[in-house]
Amino acid sequence: MSEGAYQRLWESSHATLQELLDQEQLLLEPAPDRERQSFQYRLASLYLHYLGLLRRFDTVYDQMVQPQKRRLLRRLLDGVAGRVLELKDELVRADLCENHCLDRVLQDFKLTPADLEVPIPKYFLLEQSTTVRERGLILAEILSRLEPVSSQKSFTGMHRTEAIILVQKAERARQGRLRATFMREIRRDEEQDGRIREDGWHKFSQGQAAVTIQKVWKGYLQRKRTQQDRRMEMEFIGMLPSPNQVEHLSIISQPCLVEDVQRLRQMEKEEEFRAAMVKAHDSLVETEGPDMKEKMKEQIRQWFIECHDLTGRFPDYPDASSGGSYSIFADKTPEQVRMELEMQMQENRKKEQEKSKEKGKDEKEKKKGKEEKAKKGEVDAVLQVLPSKCIPMICAGHEEYLNTWKNRCESIHPSQNYDSETLREEKRKEVELEIRIQVDELMRQELRKLRLAVDKEEERPLRAPKKTPGKKTGKKKEKDLTSDRSVESLYEELVISGLLRKSESVALKDYIGDFLYLGSTLSLVKKLPMPSLFDIRQNVALYAVLRLGSPDIHIMAPLIRSILLVGPSGMGKKMLVKAVCTETGANLFDLSPENLLGKYPGRNGAQMMVHIVFKVARLLQPSVIWIGNAEKNFYKKTPKEDKEMDPKRIKKDLTKALRLLTPGDRVMLIGTTSRPQLAEMRGLCRVYERILFMPRPDYASRYVLWKRMIEARGIQPTQHLDISALAKVSDGYTPGHILQAIQSVLSERRFLQLSKRPLVASEFLGQLVKLDPVYREEEESLKDWYFKTPLGKKSMKHRMDQLEAEEAKLDKEKKKRK
């Protein structure tokens, strides 16, 4: 895409953003519980449109070169990402489940499941690539020091006679195989000649022989042409992949090269802009600084005089924490300040009179409302969205675009150089704030002298606001048990003890799964739709990747400290943990019970271990703390075989450490378990704020799994391989089982035979039979457990209430008919 195309995409994105901001006002209106479906539909439509907007802003930010526009785009990108996470939280509260049936909404807006993909901003890794690389080198260096120097393997000697016998055996075997092949061919030729003699020779004339040869040859040519035409047609309509993979890869790689060139240009323009920022700041301080200082002093002196004339005393000077004099003179004249003071005094008097009247009225109205509701028996729940932290930021960015960039006459190829006038305006505000701090200090001293000279009054100390008794504000600060140690030493200690590991590089898109196409249909017939692998991937992207990727998004988004992945073995839980680390460049800490065996023994040791892990995780953000077999930390009754590792010893310290995480601490606890029934429900749900249930893959996901995993081995499926049949037969098997079957079948030897013997479905069935599937009893047990979680209970209660309401409605209709 050209620079003009990115400019047009930016403009169209702001037009869409304006429409969404208008819709936000309608969403603020509370809705009764009986209108839950329409409320969910409005939330889902907003969520979908914000996802599309996030995708477009990410594309423009990644390729826009102009540095000032990029800064605005970054704020908008973070704001929209935060709003997506807020809407996801609202959808969970409205739907009472983690997966949402959005197929009807997609159909109404003529969108595809690809539009539901959560885009991961590219700057997550690009802007911290240096940090991630340096951290990887440090980790590799520590690990190399731990590994013992591999000594040369000593091979057992072989006697010369034994070696000769071994070579002779191999050579004789080779000659025997060749002789057997040769004899097989001779025998086959003899049998063929014998059959011909028995049938007798058929004499052809020259013309008949020519016609026969032509007939066979023309038939062969026509079959070949028909097959080729059919393949071309199937490739054209997208039913078969293109055979020319080299051409396909070259087409894909060309835009990537252009994007890399654009990023190099971004770095050059950014360096120019930073140098210009320093130059503009210094220039403004020298040229306009003295005039600004004198103007501020005159304005503040005039305020002193006006207040003294109006109230008979000099005002209290605003504290620096409240903005100093800026809070009073923000684009105001002395006359406006005087009018405001008079209005404030009048309003204060009115408020005092109205408060006493309103108290009595409110109490009476509350009593009446309660009595009426009690009589009617109607206590209708209200659905309403929570106040957004991101909307003000988005509105400010959109307004800046309208005021600064919208009405500019840009050419087809807009200039990518910075705008000096806009830069000077921004720097002028910064210089003004710096000078105002200096002026405030001088004017506070001048105010003291005025009070002494005019009112003969000493300086009045500012009274601290009274604290309400019985209420504790803030949280207790964590006691630093390792204040005398550096981060580097703690980091090395964790690596040596095996608590900090190198994560494998796994992209989140490699977690393959398809969309649930019949979610709304299942809901209509009162069947509970289970999440697909697509839903699981999206939830992990929303709950973990987007939050950990950016500090600004983490601060604005609803705080989520921990998630628990629950599902049978082979569902890819560990793969998702690695994908989160890869997509965000996060450190991976392993606090699995098996990994803690023999490390940091005793009660104090466990406390120290959790403290060090969370301290390093906070200092080297982003970080992922993984606990495999998470149910063991909350065993109802510890089995005999696990008593030695004492898995419950970090339970208390883990809960305390999680509570200390605040917005801005990009640390995520991710637990994985396949047997949550063994754990105490209350403790597990207290630690893990979000629980993602991972059932067996459905037909659509299994079909995509078979196809993509075979293609990943470098093989294009042919018509001989019935993938649909494989997807049906493999019901009950996890992605791990499917991968094992593919790896077993596609050996090196089988790969070499593909040209002569194409793959067929029966080859994979033999391998699947050897594996144990996820039986229905196991999955039902996991479902029953999930519906005992807090969110699962709410969902089941809501469904029961709906069924009861429908039954009551049907009973009323039957009575009316009678």
UniProtKB/Swiss-Prot annotation:
InterPro entries: ATPase_AAA_core (IPR003959), IQ_motif_EF-hand-BS (IPR000048), N-DRC_Component (IPR052267), P-loop_NTPase (IPR027417)
Record field: transmembrane: none
Chain intervals with Basic and acidic residues compositional bias: 798-818
Keywords in alphabetical order: ATP-binding, Nucleotide-binding
Key word Aminoacyl-tRNA synthetase present: no
Residues annotated for ATP binding in this entry: 567-574
Pfam families: AAA, IQ
Domain IQ as annotated: residue spans: 206-235
Molecular function, one GO term: microtubule severing ATPase activity
Alphabetized SMART domains for the sequence: IQ
Family: Belongs to the AAA ATPase family.
The protein's name in its UniProt record: IQ and AAA domain-containing protein 1-like
Source species: Homo sapiens (Human)
